[in-house]
Design a protein with these regions (language model features):
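Transmembrane beta-barrel wall of Gram-negative outer-membrane proteins
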Residues: 125-155, 160-198, 240-250, 471
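Gram-negative outer-membrane beta-barrel transporters
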Residues: 426, 540-542, 563-680
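Extracytoplasmic beta-strand/coil segments of soluble accessory domains associated
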Residues: 21-62, 78, 84
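Acidic/polar loop-and-plug regions of large Gram-negative outer-membrane beta-barrel proteins
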Residues: 175, 183-246, 269-322, 386-400, ...
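Conserved C-terminal beta-signal and adjacent last beta-strands/turns
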Residues: 189, 227, 484, 519, ...
């Protein structure tokens, strides 16, 4: 298995003020970035696959949000302080859960009974007002009990305009070794935070027009009387509580069970506007240029002009701000049984159960000087056959105040039940395994905005999925080994992208939704010695029936449409090399090279439906399904490069212990062949209905590299130890 393990020393020495995933940026085929630059807004891609296709776990418990598969790292800001190890498997991997991952898995293992007694306090200061204070204390294992506690606070201004943040993190673990057969462990962790964001997607030429360049935030500006305003804002708290039981049944068998719950509360801002101003909150036009409609002379967003517009209006606020609330409740059970059969076989089997409810609504938080807001743009799309209020003119033109609901109010439900198993054979130089899983995922909605109580609950969609994979490793001698893995994955589509015609406003199921299929093959070679280590991996992953779609609007009709594409396929293949050399005592040199070819390789087809699942012509008129008049579009994606992740990366680093306690380090990472992420746009598809649309490879981002340097000094302070560390990230000032 292609695997990397990050230990606490590496995290302490190299992470500094970076986002937690950025500790992985020198790992082959991993692309970690800050995205817009707001606190916790980072993401990590593995072998070209985005976070929804990378399984992220804490102590083996899955963390990916169940409606979209996404990971929001701001929810886990404090994990770096209590991480015992961060295990990253690229490719098929060996994660013991029923739901499969495509790109790989990241498992963060936290402290438990093996933590030594002691504790510490720390303070960190960095650029742009960054501050962090933290403490931790552990009792070690005493009389069968072990307790670990951590608390931290981070705050700062952010290096991007107007991206202030304040974050707390906490971790608590109480473990009890009942006897030599049973141990229980209760873990509580969370990271409440708020932060301002930057979410625009400007062309490089647009960034370069501004004096602040890459610190520029297009939604940062000033309101009446000069008060600072930022349209991008996020606040969230997602505590997780897990109760683990470890049972050593006998010398050959054990049972590990985790019962967990996660309750998320929070959301983020989204601008609202009437028909004239509904797109005015977007800082970037579709062509990547700056939206200048509400732009002050100095380039900042002109909130004062919005106040002026609303206060002069006789019809309430023309533009307003809502908070998109995304609360959830998640309950799960994960249990794994392990036993040894005979001398050479190990068998694993388990159960993975999950229940998830997400509550999604939007409430007004700022009228920007107006007396009220009329949500006519959304309410005009409510159909009388779904909600009797659609015939009530007073409801359609209701004067809404702060706290009232706009544009959406629904619950998303996901349940998953699965089993998994694995058999391993180990004898002499040969180790083999075969593994499989089967799971059923069910989705449904309950809508309170577009549907009345009689029609609020949607039908249920369930998808059976599974995996079959196997592999072998052979040690040629004490230094050399080779391995191979092969696997097939059938994966349920996500609630957010494909199951419903429109996840925000429609209970109609997408008739064309099917499982995504993945076939993957890996080959590897490894060499180990006291002074030199090398790993070489080759992989090829075919991704079939990828979920993709877009919404469509019509100029001469209030009807809204949705096109869900079928037959979207992609191929991810590449080679990875990593080496480590210890040429002299106290000096360690590392290097990495990753060369990839990730591209789409199919022609996809999509038909046009409205939010009620009724087929439409290209003019938005109701027609017969799959008839000649039923509007469709063919999209030729052949050889379009997969974007959002560098397809060529290399890195090298050095770590030298100058003298006892003093260590210096430097790491350089280079990214090339990184293409912009392409996305099907409804405005483009609507122009090509009835035709074949050819997508070209998106813009290739210029190659770039970044060097980070670090230093740490560990010294005695009486009976305790002190550590001073310093980091300079991007020391070469690469833009």
């Amino acid at each position: 298995v292609a695997v990397a393990v990050i230990d606490p020393v590496a995290i302490e020495n190299k992470l500094s003020t970076q986002e937690f995933p950025e500790i992985l940026k020198s790992t082959p085929s991993i692309y970690a970035t800050k995205q817009g630059g707001g606190f916790g807004d980072s993401r990590v891609n593995v072998r070209g696959f985005e976070s929804e296709n990378v399984a992220v776990m804490v102590n083996g418990v899955p963390m990916n949000e169940m409606e979209s598969g996404k990971i929001y790292w701001s929810n886990w800001a404090g994990l770096s302080d209590v991480t015992r190890s961060m295990q990253v498997q690229r490719g098929l991997g060996a994660a013991k859960v029923a739901a499969p991952s495509v790109g790989g898995s990241i498992n963060i293992v936290t402290n438990t009974t093996d933590v030594k007694a002691g504790g510490g306090i720390s303070y960190a200061v960095g650029n742009d007002g960054f501050n962090k204070i933290a403490f931790n204390v552990s009792t070690g294992l005493r009389n069968g009990w072990a307790i670990s506690i951590l608390g931290a606070k981070s705050w700062g201004n952010g290096y991007v305009q107007g991206t202030e943040f304040e974050a707390y993190s906490y971790f608590g673990n109480v473990s009890k070794q009942i006897n030599d057969k049973h141990m229980i462990s209760l873990t509580v962790l969370g990271a409440p935070q708020w932060h301002n964001q930057r979410n625009d997607n400007l062309l490089i030429s647009e960034w370069q027009k501004h004096a602040n360049k890459y610190k520029f935030n297009a939604v940062y500006g000033f309101g009446l009387n000069g008060q600072r305003k930022v349209a991008g804002y996020n606040k969230f708290h997602k505590p997780q509580i897990s109760l683990n039981h470890y049972w050593t049944i006998n010398e050959k068998s054990s049972l590990s069970t985790a019962l967990y719950v996660s309750i998320g509360r929070g959301g983020g801002y989204r601008g609202q506007g009437n028909s004239t101003y509904k797109n005015s909150w977007y800082a970037t036009a579709l062509d990547g240029t700056l939206n200048t409609q509400f732009r002050a002379a100095d380039g900042t967003f002109d909130y004062a002009a919005i106040y002026d517009l609303n206060m002069k209006s006789e019809n309430g606020s023309q533009m307003a701000m809502s908070n998109n609330i995304n609360n959830h409740e998640w309950y799960g059970l994960l249990s794994t049984y392990t036993t040894q059969l005979g001398q050479y076989f190990n068998v694993y089997g388990g159960l993975d159960l999950r229940y998830y409810k997400g509550t999604h609504k939007a409430v007004l938080v700022d009228l920007y000087g107006g007396d009220y807001y009329v949500d006519s743009e959304s309410r005009k799309n409510v159909k009388a056959e779904n909600n009797a209020l659609a015939q009530d003119a007073n409801w359609k033109n209701e004067k809404l105040k702060v706290g009232d609901v706009v544009y959406r109010n629904y619950d998303g439900f996901v349940t998953q039940e699965g089993v998994f198993g694995q058999v391993e054979f180990n004898r002499n130089a040969l180790a083999t395994f075969i593994a499989g899983s089967v799971s059923n995922t069910m989705y449904w909605r309950y809508d309170r905005f577009y549907y009345d109580k009689a029609h609020a609950k949607s039908g249920k969609a369930d998808f059976w999925s599974g995996t079959v994979k196997g592999g072998a490793n052979y040690n040629l001698d004490e230094h050399n080994n080779v391995f191979a893995n092969i696997g097939f994955i059938s994966k349920a589509p996500f609630f957010e992208y494909a199951v419903f015609l429109n996840k925000e406003n429609s209970n109609e199921l997408n008739k064309d939704a099917v499982n995504e299929k993945i076939f993957s093959v890996e080959l590897g070679y490894g060499f180990r010695s006291p002074v030199f280590t090398a790993n070489l991996n080759l992989y090829r992953t075919a991704w079939m029936d990828k979920s993709m779609g877009a919404s469509v609007t019509f100029q001469d009709s209030d009807e809204r449409g949705r096109i869900n594409m079928t037959g979207v396929d992609a191929l991810h293949q590449g080679v990875e090399l990593e080496v480590m050399v210890k040429p002299v005592r106290n000096l360690e040199l590392t290097g990495m090279l990753s060369l990839a070819d990730w591209r789409c390789n199919s022609r996809a087809t999509g038909y046009l439906y409205n939010d009620q699942g009724i087929p439409l012509t290209k003019d938005g008129v109701v027609t017969t399904e799959k008839s000649k008049e039923h509007a469709k579009v063919d999209v030729d994606l052949k050889d379009v490069k997969v974007g959002n992740s560098a397809q060529t990366t290399f890195a090298f680093g050095a770590n030298y212990q100058v003298l006892k306690g003093l260590r210096l380090g430097a790491d350089y990472t280079h990214w090339a062949r990184n293409y912009a992420k392409f996305k099907l746009q409804g405005s483009d598809l609507s122009k090509e209905l009835g035709k074949t649309m050819k997508y070209d490879t998106p813009w290739k981002i210029p190659s770039a590299g970044s060097m980070d340097v670090n230093m740490s000094y560990r010294f005695p302070l009486g009976k305790v130890w002190g550590i001073i560390s310093a980091n300079v990230n991007n020391v070469l000032d690469q833009e």
